[in-house]
Amino acid sequence: MIPLSHNNTPTELENYVKLKGQSLTIQDFSAHDFQGVKKIVRDRLHTLQGELCVYCEKKYSVDEMQVEHIKPKSGRNAQPNLCFTYSNYAVSCIQENRKTQTCGQKKKDNILFIEPTSPSCNSHFSLDTDGFINPRGFKNRKEKHSIQTTIDMLGLNKPHLQLERKKQIERLIYILKATKHNRHELTNKFIKSGNFKYILRELTM
């Protein structure tokens, strides 16, 4: 998960909200006149996130991403007051195949117990050498369940993600074993250059 620190709200989004005023509703998020603003928001976040999905940390083109409400705008957990709040936005991946859908598509209108807006979000996870993400740092059974629910809600251990992480870990271990000098520098460079750059730092061996 990317620990997301938002920059300034795009001017276009601020202007749209001001223009609509009291008439603004969550339906406007899908309205034709908001799509240009949404594209600006998506492009900005895509760059901010280093072209990675906020949840699975895989790299995607901007057209393979959607603007995600971290706290849902509709449904039983709706927080419509945050529908046009920039700090409630992230971009997450889009999968056409329903079997491989993860992240925002799988989360839908549910509430995450661990959100990417927390700087310490990844401290709740550990990554094993098989590529599985597991709960960590929990104080009791309830907290462990909350962490596991977040992992499951986002589908972070779906086979295709787990296998891709495993391959990346194997490459990292190879570098560690093959390198005698500048090991820290080389492993840092490897982690920063690819997918899973944050969760890889939670690897336990």
Curated annotation (Swiss-Prot):
| InterPro entries (UniProt xref) | HNH78-like (IPR013467), HNH_nuc (IPR003615)
Swiss-Prot/TrEMBL keywords: Antiviral defense, Endonuclease, Hydrolase, Nuclease
What GO annotations for molecular function exist for this entry?
A: endonuclease activity
SMART domains xref list: HNHc
Can you supply a Gene Ontology BP term from the record? defense response to virus
Q: Cross-referenced CDD domains, in alphabetical order?
A: HNHc (cd00085)
Summarizing the function annotation, the protein's role is: Putative HNH endonuclease component of antiviral defense system retron Vc95, composed of a non-coding RNA (ncRNA), a reverse transcriptase (RT), a probable ATP-binding protein and this protein. Expression of retron Vc95 confers protection against bacteriophages T2, T4 and T6. At multiplicity of infection (MOI) of 0.02 cultures slow growth when infected with T4 but do not collapse, at MOI 2 cultures enter growth stasis.
NCBIfam families recorded for this chain?
retron system putative HNH endonuclease
* UniProt protein name: Retron Vc95 putative HNH endonuclease
**Native source organism of the sequence:** Vibrio cholerae serotype O1 biovar El Tor
